[in-house]
């Protein structure tokens, strides 16, 4: 699968994330950001008073992840005139490869724009909103970042063309041959499949061990009865 956003945009995104101190080790962007906690931390890094971290619970369950994202959308992103649609939140919570990048790229732009305006002491939040009142899905990368002919982010997601999953040390995979990125993504998928296979085999082993224990109990019981019968015959 080819990357839908040009490599330079991704390169800049991973550098940005790598340079912000986060509470978790950076391993896999799709999984790391799936529960919304690290997104809240990114925003808090820029605007500490805007985010109360106790509202965001590290989660593995889909329900809690969606709860975190819903709260983030209503209480924080709304203040930035930024919104993540429900279907996109669900894809992020499900760790769909490449989807969270489509949120982080425009979110970074929004955060840095607001920070610049605050430093200059001009502009209100309303000035940060798109002129046509369009939402997140209609926001794209500036042409300079996207490169000539690159599609808008919202269009990419609508057409079902997510980015490839990225390996640990987000920016590292972009060094050297771009085909390395695809190879890493494929290896990650193979690893996940292997882990699932191992889990299934472990369950089978436990089941067989349980059956063996039952058989041993049965054998012991029969042996005891046989011994009792032999003693009676004597």
Curated annotation (Swiss-Prot):
<dbReference type="GO" id="GO:0016324">
    <property type="term" value="C:apical plasma membrane"/>
</dbReference>
<dbReference type="InterPro" id="IPR001715">
    <property type="entry name" value="CH_dom"/>
</dbReference>
<dbReference type="GO" id="GO:0005737">
    <property type="term" value="C:cytoplasm"/>
</dbReference>
<dbReference type="GO" id="GO:0030027">
    <property type="term" value="C:lamellipodium"/>
</dbReference>
<keyword id="KW-0282">Flagellum</keyword>
<dbReference type="GO" id="GO:0005930">
    <property type="term" value="C:axoneme"/>
</dbReference>
<dbReference type="InterPro" id="IPR052111">
    <property type="entry name" value="Spermatogenesis_Ciliary_MAP"/>
</dbReference>
<dbReference type="GO" id="GO:0046847">
    <property type="term" value="P:filopodium assembly"/>
</dbReference>
<keyword id="KW-0493">Microtubule</keyword>
<keyword id="KW-0472">Membrane</keyword>
<keyword id="KW-0963">Cytoplasm</keyword>
<protein>
    <recommendedName>
        <fullName>Sperm flagellar protein 1</fullName>
    </recommendedName>
</protein>
<dbReference type="GO" id="GO:0005874">
    <property type="term" value="C:microtubule"/>
</dbReference>
<dbReference type="GO" id="GO:0097729">
    <property type="term" value="C:9+2 motile cilium"/>
</dbReference>
<keyword id="KW-0206">Cytoskeleton</keyword>
<dbReference type="Pfam" id="PF06294">
    <property type="entry name" value="CH_2"/>
</dbReference>
<dbReference type="GO" id="GO:0016323">
    <property type="term" value="C:basolateral plasma membrane"/>
</dbReference>
<dbReference type="GO" id="GO:0097542">
    <property type="term" value="C:ciliary tip"/>
</dbReference>
<dbReference type="GO" id="GO:0016477">
    <property type="term" value="P:cell migration"/>
</dbReference>
<dbReference type="GO" id="GO:0030032">
    <property type="term" value="P:lamellipodium assembly"/>
</dbReference>
<dbReference type="GO" id="GO:0005902">
    <property type="term" value="C:microvillus"/>
</dbReference>
<feature type="domain" description="Calponin-homology (CH)">
    <location>
        <begin position="7"/>
        <end position="112"/>
    </location>
</feature>
<dbReference type="GO" id="GO:0007026">
    <property type="term" value="P:negative regulation of microtubule depolymerization"/>
</dbReference>
<keyword id="KW-0009">Actin-binding</keyword>
<dbReference type="GO" id="GO:0001725">
    <property type="term" value="C:stress fiber"/>
</dbReference>
<comment type="function">
    <text>Microtubule-associated protein that promotes microtubule bundling and stabilizes microtubules against depolymerization in response to cold shock. Microtubule-associated protein involved in the stabilization of microtubules along the axis of migration during radial intercalation. Promotes the establishment and stabilization of an axis of microtubules required for the active migration of cells into the outer epithelium.</text>
</comment>
<dbReference type="GO" id="GO:0003341">
    <property type="term" value="P:cilium movement"/>
</dbReference>
<dbReference type="GO" id="GO:0031514">
    <property type="term" value="C:motile cilium"/>
</dbReference>
<keyword id="KW-0970">Cilium biogenesis/degradation</keyword>
<feature type="region of interest" description="Essential for homodimerization and microtubule bundling activity">
    <location>
        <begin position="181"/>
        <end position="234"/>
    </location>
</feature>
<dbReference type="GO" id="GO:1904158">
    <property type="term" value="P:axonemal central apparatus assembly"/>
</dbReference>
<dbReference type="GO" id="GO:0003779">
    <property type="term" value="F:actin binding"/>
</dbReference>
<dbReference type="GO" id="GO:0001578">
    <property type="term" value="P:microtubule bundle formation"/>
</dbReference>
<dbReference type="GO" id="GO:0030175">
    <property type="term" value="C:filopodium"/>
</dbReference>
<comment type="subunit">
    <text>Homodimer. Interacts with actin, TJP1, CGN and CDH1.</text>
</comment>
<dbReference type="GO" id="GO:1990716">
    <property type="term" value="C:axonemal central apparatus"/>
</dbReference>
<keyword id="KW-0966">Cell projection</keyword>
<dbReference type="GO" id="GO:0008017">
    <property type="term" value="F:microtubule binding"/>
</dbReference>
<keyword id="KW-0969">Cilium</keyword>
<dbReference type="InterPro" id="IPR010441">
    <property type="entry name" value="CH_2"/>
</dbReference>
<dbReference type="GO" id="GO:2000095">
    <property type="term" value="P:regulation of Wnt signaling pathway, planar cell polarity pathway"/>
</dbReference>
<dbReference type="InterPro" id="IPR036872">
    <property type="entry name" value="CH_dom_sf"/>
</dbReference>
């Amino acid at each position: 699968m080819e990357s839908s956003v040009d490599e330079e945009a991704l390169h800049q995104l991973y550098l940005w994330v790598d340079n912000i101190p986060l509470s978790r080790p950076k391993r896999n962007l799709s999984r790391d950001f799936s529960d919304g906690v690290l997104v809240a931390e990114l925003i808090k890094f820029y605007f500490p008073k805007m985010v109360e971290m106790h509202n965001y619970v590290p989660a593995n369950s889909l329900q809690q992840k969606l709860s975190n994202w819903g709260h983030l959308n209503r209480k924080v992103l709304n203040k930035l005139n930024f919104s993540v649609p429900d279907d996109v939140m669900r894809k992020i919570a499900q760790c769909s490869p490449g989807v969270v990048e489509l949120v982080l790229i425009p979110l970074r732009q929004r955060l840095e724009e607001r920070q610049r305006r605050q430093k200059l002491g001009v502009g209100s939040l309303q000035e940060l909103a798109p002129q046509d009142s369009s939402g997140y899905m209609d926001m794209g990368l500036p042409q300079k970042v996207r490169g000539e002919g690159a599609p808008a982010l919202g269009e990419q997601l609508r057409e079902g063309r997510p980015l490839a999953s990225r390996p640990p040390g987000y920016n590292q995979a972009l060094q050297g041959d771009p085909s390395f990125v695809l190879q890493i993504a494929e290896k990650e998928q193979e690893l996940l499949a292997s882990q699932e296979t191992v889990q299934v085999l472990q369950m089978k082993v436990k089941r067989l061990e349980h059956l063996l224990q039952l058989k041993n109990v049965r054998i012991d019981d029969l042996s005891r009865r046989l011994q009792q019968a032999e003693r009676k015959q004597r």
